[in-house]
Each structure stands twice: as structure tokens, then as C-alpha cells.
Amino acid sequence: MTTSGVRVRIAPSPTGEPHVGTAYIALFNYLFAKKHGGEFILRIEDTDATRSTPEFETKVLDALKWCGLEWKEGPDIGGPYGPYRQSDRKPIYQPYAQELLDKGHAFRCFCTPARLEQMREAQRAAGKPPKYDGLCLSLTAEEVTSRTAAGEASVIRMKIPPEGSCDFTDGVYGDVSIPWDSVDMQVLIKADGMPTYHMANVIDDHLMKITHVARGEEWLASVPKHILLYRYFGWDQPVFMHLSLMRNADKSKLSKRKNPTSISYYSALGYIPEALMNFLGLFFIQIAEGEELLTMDELSEKFDPDNLSKAGAIFDIQKLDWLNGRWIREKLSEEEFQARVLAWAMENDRLKAGLRLSQTRISKLGELPDLAGFLLKSDLGLQPSDFAKIKSPPEEILEILNTVQPDLEKILEWNVETIEAELRAISDRMGKKLKVVVSPLFVAVSGSPRSLPLFDSMAILGRSVVRQRLKLAAQAVAALVGAK
């Protein structure tokens, strides 16, 4: 693998809470650059204008900084190849799109969303994978000009070779061959003029002189589109490396439904960043048992990108807890430990919000742990007996928990008002009084039938923690139902 003049990047999309999977890919790129004396840069890929927000961008940057990752160039510090935010680069992409049209490598497509959906439904009914059928390929230049002048909306799609295969070597998967007839005529420029991921990704990587592209294995099937774009533009392509996805213990894809996936979840609960990076870094190295405790420099020394496994990296929270405990006990001096605790407490938004709610509800400071301690716990240790005191039967409690969990995911802005509104709506849909619905939620969220106000507590804890606690509560109640 060629490694001279290495430049790698992490390119997160600011469409939600920063994911541990982003930290996983970022760490690989960071270690790769560090190992080869190269440069690690950060680019924000916000071409999804409907879901990308400045707030999520800030959270992503803050989360990666908390992880201890430092980039040489990025939207927050600038650099010679900026802007480093794709929405700020929109004018850059248009000439390249026109170049593809002029060279006959792309075409305008006027198919409506309704027509495309009908096409996909017909393909699925015939047992075929959905992909564009090429209807607009036959349009003449005059027809395209006329329809465009009439104000008809269009996108720009790339042309795909009609036969043969795309053969390439991946840094992890080795030699790969993908038939061209399985590759879709990808949209490159959307109707609003914004590029899709595929178009912007290739252009930005070239202009930013990226030499190695390391990303999740879910992008492996997209490599033919990217290689084709490099060929169409006459550019040298980077080395591709597709990393195995992180998985749950049952080998399923890591998801927020089974494990907390937000970096902020681990930060707020008192995990230390060195331990999280240590844990993620173990997926990229080979060590003997007993050698697991490693600093970033030690991870870099042992890092070997030529011996990566295609097997899924198992995200074992128990192992993370074990490593975090070892870091606290073995790597931090007493003074540093105290400083970390104080800094964590002072910067902990949950604690601050909990103190504000608690001030009017206590008569002694010593009452705080019982009243608000649940805000800082990683595990409430819920037992089936904790729900036995609720008047509703276990079957009804389980129904409530199983209904509330997915419905809360519909909330776009997670705050007191939206949580209350959704829970009231759930109560109406279930035909139950609000008190009946929220009673088990008090126990699920705080571990007690009486605590700080429920809606405030849920807002303070955040979506990831509430999701996890409701899941564990449902498991506890299911055991109660099974015992009857």
C-alpha cells in the first residue's frame, strides 16, 4: 500500500447526534495519518439540506475534540483547500457537472418522483433490484433544452457502462469485482442544484488531495460509481479501504435500538475519552491478552492497516466499562482523577439542569443524591419488583413501554414541550389517562415512582439515555409478565 504524502479525512454528516461509528472511522484515519507522518483533515458533508443543522455540526466537532482527535484542516480552523463544508462549496461542483454533460458521461433526467416510484415498484414486483431504467438517456439535446427552458425540473445522472465489470483492489477486502449491470445510474446533481454524496465526495477528495479513503464497508458497493467518476474526470483515484462495521454482541449492525450509539451518551455518563479511544483502537491492532491498556501513542505504534479483519468489530459495553475502570484506577493520578471528576461535574449539563430543578424541592444538600442521582447513573439496575408497586397490571405496563419507545423516536426537537406533547398524544391514541402512561415511565427513567418532573428529566437525560432506559425497563417488566 502506497503511503507517501498521506492525506486522509473524516467526513461526517451533521444530521443527528454524533455516533460512536464516526469516532471509530475517525480514529482509524487519525492513526493511519499518525503512523505514516501524514495529515488528517475534517470535512462536513451536509448535502442533505433537510436533515443537516448547524447545531448537529457543532455537536460533531465537539464530540470528536472530546475524543482527543485533532485535525490539521477543517471548517473550524480553515486550511488551504477550503471551504471544508460542502454546502459552502456548491459553486465548485457546477462546472464539473457541466463537464460530464459536455463529454457525454452524464445526462439530464426529467423523471418525476411519482414515475420513479412506479418504476421501482414494478422492478420489485418482478424480483429485480430497483435502479434507474434509463428512460431519459434517449432524449435529444433539443428536447433537453426545450424542457429545461419550460422550467421542467431535472437532475443530472451519471452514465454507466452497459457491460463488463469494475475491478479494483480494496485495502481490506483485496481484489473486488462488481458487474456494471448491477450499478445504478446515480443522481449526481439534485433538482435544487446541490450535489449528491457521490459527486461531492469524489470532487472534494480530489481537490483536497486525499490519498487514502477509509470508510465503513457499507460504501464498498458504491466504489464503482466513484472509480467511474475519477476516470471520467481523468484523475488518479485514492486507495480505498472499507472497514468492517461495528456490531452488537449478536453480530447485528450496531444501532441505537440495541446499544447507546451517541458519543455524548458516554461523555455525559463519565466515560473518559482515552478509554473510549483505547477501546475502539483495539479493533485495529493485534495484541496479546493483558496488553489492552494503551494510550493514543501506543495505539499508533501498534497500528497495522495491512492486517485488518473483515469480521465485524463487536461493540462490547462490558469490555468498555472494564477498560474505563482500568484507566481510572491505573492511568490517572489521585490529583488528576479529582480534577477530571470536578471538570466533568462542572461541564455536565445534566447535573446543572438537575440542580436547577432540585433547588426548590430539597431542604438539605444531602437530599440531592436521592432526588437527582438518577441523572448521572449509567445503569439504574431496574428489577421486576420496581414495577410491582404500580397500580396497572404488568401486561398493561409492558404495552405502554413498548408503545412509547418507538413513538418517542418521532420527536424531531427533543425538549420538555415536545416530549410532553408526544406523551399526551400517545395517551390519547392508547385511550388511557396520562397518569396511567407516565407512571411506569417515572420508574423506567428515574428508578423511582416519585422523582423530579418526568418531562424535564427526559429532556435532561437526552434521547439516547431515555431510549436505553425504556428498553431495560421493558425487559424487566417482561420478566414480571413471564413470572405470572
UniProtKB/Swiss-Prot annotation:
- List the EC numbers from the record: 6.1.1.17
Which reaction equations make up its catalytic activity?
tRNA(Glu) + L-glutamate + ATP = L-glutamyl-tRNA(Glu) + AMP + diphosphate
Q: Where is this motif: 'KMSKS' region?
A: 253-257
Cellular compartments annotated: Cytoplasm
User: In chain numbering, where does the motif 'HIGH' region fall?
Assistant: 12-22
GO-annotated molecular function: ATP binding; glutamate-tRNA ligase activity; tRNA binding; zinc ion binding
Q: InterPro entries recorded for this chain?
A: aa-tRNA-synth_I_cd-bd, aa-tRNA-synth_I_codon-bd_sub2, aa-tRNA-synth_I_CS, aa_tRNA-synth_I_cd-bd_sf, Glu-tRNA-ligase_bac/mito, Glu/Gln-tRNA-synth, Glu/Gln-tRNA-synth_Ib_cat-dom, GluQ/Sye
The positions annotated for binding ATP are K256
UniProt keyword list:
Aminoacyl-tRNA synthetase, ATP-binding, Cytoplasm, Ligase, Nucleotide-binding, Protein biosynthesis
Q: Which GO terms describe its biological process?
A: glutamyl-tRNA aminoacylation
- What GO CC terms are in its UniProt record? cytosol
Q: Which domain of life is it from?
A: Bacteria
Question: What quaternary structure, including any partners, is listed in this protein's UniProt entry?
Answer: Monomer.
> What is the designated name of this protein?
Glutamate--tRNA ligase
Q: Native species of this protein?
A: Rhizobium etli (strain CIAT 652)
| Top-level taxonomy | Bacteria, Pseudomonadati, Pseudomonadota, Alphaproteobacteria, Hyphomicrobiales
Q: Which gene encodes it?
A: gltX
